[in-house]
């Protein structure tokens, strides 16, 4: 575990080129090192909203899962600046999968390429007895325009298989039905099948360019239609 954080003036070492992402507790910047001119991504996590232990868990999960060719590289440096915990990651020049998919999807060939790589990354994570829990288009970064290199990122939600956690505001289209049914702040057990469910949503979107439903709940007509199809197939198997 990291015992302390070096206080630095981030502007002395980096030029912040642009803000490329922002969440409720963090910001992500494209930056250029003033000396080497290397481009990196800096993730800045608000220290008033996240504890040092929570930040360390995300950083250690990120750096511990590399090297794998389809896991985003995190560099071996952490620091603190202006009320933020920060670490540096490699830069994905083509952005995330969301910005690379048309309204018609990726097509079968590119979908196969993406899914083979993301599947390999998830298999690696699961082999460590861990679950990602946030597999979505925004967390798959594109490094080559023909999709021969994509990488899974954002390991802030990584937990050990079987851990008991509190339900927060999971992104509904990616949330399995058993979690949709739970109330906010209710406890549930982490399982790798949640990653598999989310991965399935990614595959669907890559092929068709749309989400299968807004939420995995019987009140959603698209999910209701899926359940009817699934139940019909199950009865035939019997």
Please place each PLM-identified region on the residue numbering:
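Activation segment/activation loop of eukaryotic-type protein kinase catalytic domains
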Residues: 141-174, 184
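Catalytic-loop of the protein kinase fold
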Residues: 126-143
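AlphaC helix of the protein kinase catalytic domain
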Residues: 97-106
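Conserved short submotifs of the Hanks-type protein kinase catalytic core
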Residues: 82-96
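Activation segment signature within eukaryotic-like protein kinase domains
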Residues: 114-115
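Short beta-strand micro-motifs within the conserved protein kinase catalytic domain, predominantly
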Residues: 73-85
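Glycine-rich ATP phosphate-binding loop
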Residues: 27-32, 36-47
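The N-lobe alphaC helix and its flanking beta3-alphaC-beta4 segment of protein kinase-like domains
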Residues: 44-66
């Amino acid at each position: 575990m990291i015992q302390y954080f070096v206080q630095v003036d981030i502007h002395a070492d980096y030029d912040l080129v642009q803000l490329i992402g922002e969440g409720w507790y963090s910001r992500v910047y494209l930056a250029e090192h003033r000396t080497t001119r290397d481009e990196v991504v800096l993730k800045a996590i608000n220290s008033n909203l996240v504890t040092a232990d929570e930040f360390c868990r995300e950083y250690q999960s990120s750096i511990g899962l590399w090297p794998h060719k389809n896991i985003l590289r995190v560099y071996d440096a952490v620091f603190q600046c202006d009320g933020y915990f920060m670490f540096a990651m490699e830069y994905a020049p083509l952005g995330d999968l969301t910005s690379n998919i048309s309204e018609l999807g990726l097509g079968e060939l590119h979908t196969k390429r993406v899914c083979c790589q993301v599947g390999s990354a998830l298999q690696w994570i699961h082999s460590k007895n861990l679950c990602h829990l946030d597999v979505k288009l925004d967390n798959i970064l594109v490094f080559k325009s023909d999709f021969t290199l994509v990488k899974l990122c954002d390991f802030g939600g990584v937990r050990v298989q079987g851990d008991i956690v509190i339900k927060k505001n999971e992104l509904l289209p990616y949330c399995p039905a058993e979690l949709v049914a739970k109330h906010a702040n209710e406890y549930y057990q982490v399982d790798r099948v949640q990653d598999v469910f989310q991965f399935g949503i990614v595959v669907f979107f890559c092929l068709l360019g749309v989400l299968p439903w807004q939420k995995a709940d019987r009140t959603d007509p698209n999910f209701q239609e899926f359940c009817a199809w699934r139940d019909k197939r199950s009865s035939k198997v019997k």
